Amino acid sequence: MIVYLFPTEMEAKAFRRLCPDAEVIISGVGMVATAAAIASLDRRKHLVASDMVVLAGIAGAYGEGVAVGDVVEVVSERCVDLPERFRQSYLQRVFHTKLRRVASNTIHAMGVEAEGAEIENMEGAALFAMSEVIGFRAVEVRAISNRVGESFDKWHLDEATAALAEALKRINDGE
């Protein structure tokens, strides 16, 4: 079983058009909403090791290493909003796509430093944490919509969500 988890309907819309039969869940934005959505999914479906939950959405890029419109697989996440001694990192040991692999920060506050990450998002660490607890396969796919710190009116949402949908279709088709 593959379930596609999106923080918002806006991020899911183009994928729903390309893959209308795919199982899509809108989790809500942030780590708490994502963890709750996965817990609810597990309660209903009893996730097992062969099940895959694909968290997909937009992300911001630090610096110039990843271009706006690029689609990447996140292979490590750090919770950087917490005080240093409580920060948790998650590392993906099995890769599920042919996409470029990047490190990410999961954040909820402005002004967080990259510290080795190439992108940032608001949900990824929750996916990896829940995967460790429950035991399903976790895949995080992000399309770059903006540079970190850019004002929202400069984000390339249509371009990013279209690229995301195409990449997810390839995953859904087994490519």
Region roles according to the model:
Residues 6-175:
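Glycine-rich phosphate- or other oxyanion-binding loops that anchor nucleotides, phosphorylated ligands
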Residues 1-3:
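Extreme N-terminal starter segment of soluble prokaryotic enzymes
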